[in-house]
């Protein structure tokens, strides 16, 4: 199969709004890949259309892609050949490795057509956002293999590897799915939560009674133990065992032989209050930091204990087993109630302790690994800021031809200018995209556009605009960042509305943002 086949499918899917249409388009491509009877080809195709590399990280980012050769006139690259190049790039190490990687990238892109270059660039930089994510992809795999979608989703959940499931089912049909079972030592995708507006909303949606748990702003980890062997994985299924000895020790102290647990690792201050998330995150890069910044581990769910799979057991049963095995020092605070006032007090106490909010779980919900299940709801306060738009990026896929990703700035009273805090393309409706495209083209500052574009705001990736438009932004927190001049960045920023009633002089200041950073 040629790379252009995958690149074209990516463009097609990105332009589609219908889930059924996306599913059908991807299924057609996978059916063609399946006829070549090459398991790796199928797995790579699924991974790429999901925006992932089978090799994970290969050391190529935006800097390596700034100066690329002219595109080839005709498509010749195969998926298999490109996959091999990625593996070769990822294996480069030692003296001269940067130059060697650059040479391989240049050679690859010189053989790629324009549409292929665009696809490869977006794939390598993590910006392949065409909507073909796990749900759609699982349905497409099922359609291509002519098996029930629920069976594919279940296998992908247990394997933690949809590309591998796709390769197996397209080669062996429904019978091939039987081999994908929950296994200690093989991580699965964590269950994710939907959002509730408050504890009352959560109780209503969960049937009147809920299991409320403190939501810690740490790092989600999945713990696997078989005898004296313990493995620890991140939510993206990366193995971080060697970096988190405290988690290993906590798992080994439990009175079990086999275990799979869902947990949170977090850096706490001496008074028990949490450090900023970045302090916790820093430990995932350096095991040696334990001496200066230890981590605490809090388990909140069990997927497997001593030969028994608990995925399909209700929350209430899994919690009961958890309480029997895990000491209180390693469990999150919990309240089971149908009383809205009691739930609100629990939320307020959790926030006062410095944590993010609470999780509300249905007592009857199974553990839906890898899915954002309706049985889990997160409740946390939403912070908002009025910021100023400094620039906008042209969109891709369904947003091609629309100004999409906005650059956000806070007012700096000391200089009279604005300090950039990040970007977001989240929360925008189609109507908002239409409006902001027209609005920001009006505000485009020709003098600020690159000379290479002829000062034309429509020619280039980013449009610099006059800082006149105020936008209300919701965000979950503020973290330190070396990427932006203020040393801070918003976490999970999304657009609520544009504030035409406010002038830039009324926007929030960088000092207000710094207060969020310092005090939460």
Swiss-Prot record:
InterPro entries recorded: ATP-dep_DNA_ligase (IPR050191), DNA_ligae_ATP-dep_bac/arc (IPR022865), DNA_ligase_ATP-dep (IPR000977), DNA_ligase_ATP-dep_C (IPR012309), DNA_ligase_ATP-dep_cent (IPR012310), DNA_ligase_ATP-dep_CS (IPR016059), DNA_ligase_ATP-dep_N (IPR012308), DNA_ligase_N_sf (IPR036599)
Cofactor requirements of the protein: Mg(2+)
Keywords assigned by UniProt, alphabetized: ATP-binding, Cell cycle, Cell division, DNA damage, DNA recombination, DNA repair, DNA replication, Ligase, Magnesium, Metal-binding, Nucleotide-binding
GO molecular function: ATP binding; DNA binding; DNA ligase (ATP) activity; metal ion binding
Positions that bind ATP: 213, 220, 235, 264, 300, 372, 378
Cited function: DNA ligase that seals nicks in double-stranded DNA during DNA replication, DNA recombination and DNA repair.
Family in the record: Belongs to the ATP-dependent DNA ligase family.
HAMAP family linked: DNA_ligase (MF_00407)
Protein name: Probable DNA ligase
Recorded name of the encoding gene: lig
């Amino acid at each position: 199969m040629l790379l252009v086949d995958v690149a074209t499918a990516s463009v097609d899917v990105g332009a589609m709004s219908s889930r059924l249409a996306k599913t059908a388009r991807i299924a057609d491509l996978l059916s063609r890949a399946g006829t070549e009877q090459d398991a790796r080809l199928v797995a790579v195709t699924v991974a790429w259309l999901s925006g992932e590399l089978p090799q994970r990280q290969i050391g190529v980012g935006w800097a390596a892609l700034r100066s690329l050769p002219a595109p080839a006139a005709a498509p010749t690259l195969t998926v298999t050949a490109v996959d091999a190049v990625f593996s070769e790039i990822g294996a480069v190490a030692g003296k001269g490795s940067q130059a060697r990687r650059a040479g391989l990238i240049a050679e690859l892109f010189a053989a790629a057509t324009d549409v292929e270059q665009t696809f490869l660039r977006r794939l390598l930089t993590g910006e392949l956002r065409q909507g073909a994510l796990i749900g759609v992809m699982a349905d497409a795999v099922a359609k291509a293999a002519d098996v029930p979608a629920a069976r594919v989703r279940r296998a992908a959940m247990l394997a933690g590897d949809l590309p591998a499931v796709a390769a197996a089912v397209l080669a062996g049909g429904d019978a091939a799915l039987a081999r994908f079972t929950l296994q200690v030592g093989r991580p699965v995708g964590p269950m994710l939560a939907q959002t509730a507006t408050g504890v009352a909303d959560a109780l209503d949606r969960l049937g009147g009674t809920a299991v409320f748990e403190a939501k810690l702003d740490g790092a989600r980890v999945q713990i696997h133990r078989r005898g004296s062997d313990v493995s620890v994985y991140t939510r993206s299924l990366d193995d971080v065992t060697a970096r988190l000895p405290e988690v290993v020790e906590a798992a080994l102290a439990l009175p079990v032989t086999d275990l799979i647990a869902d947990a949170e690792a977090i850096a706490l201050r001496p008074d028990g209050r949490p450090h900023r998330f970045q302090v916790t995150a820093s430990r995932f890069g350096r095991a040696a930091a334990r001496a200066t910044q230890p981590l605490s581990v809090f388990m909140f769910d069990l997927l497997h204990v001593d030969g028994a799979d608990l995925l399909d057991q209700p929350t209430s049963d899994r919690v009961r087993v958890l309480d029997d095995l895990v000491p209180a020092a390693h469990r999150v605070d919990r309240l089971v109630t149908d009383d809205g006032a009691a739930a609100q007090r629990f939320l307020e106490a959790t926030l006062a302790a410095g944590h993010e909010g609470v999780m509300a779980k249905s007592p009857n919900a199974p553990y839906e690994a890898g899915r954002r299940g309706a049985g889990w709801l997160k409740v946390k306060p939403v912070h908002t800021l009025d910021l100023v738009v400094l620039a906008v990026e042209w969109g891709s896929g369904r947003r091609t031809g629309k100004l999409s990703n906005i650059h956000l700035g806070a007012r700096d009273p000391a200089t009279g200018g604005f300090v950039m805090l990040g970007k977001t393309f989240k929360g925008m409706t189609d109507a908002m995209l239409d409006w902001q495209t027209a609005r920001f083209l009006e505000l485009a500052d020709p003098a600020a556009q690159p000379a290479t574009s002829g000062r034309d705001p429509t020619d280039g990736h980013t449009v610099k605009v006059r800082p006149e438009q105020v936008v209300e932004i919701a965000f979950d927190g503020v973290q330190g960042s070396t990427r932006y001049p203020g040393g801070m960045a918003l976490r999970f920023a999304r657009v609520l509305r544009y504030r035409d009633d406010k002038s830039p002089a009324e926007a929030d200041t960088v000092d207000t943002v710094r207060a969020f950073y310092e005090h939460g």
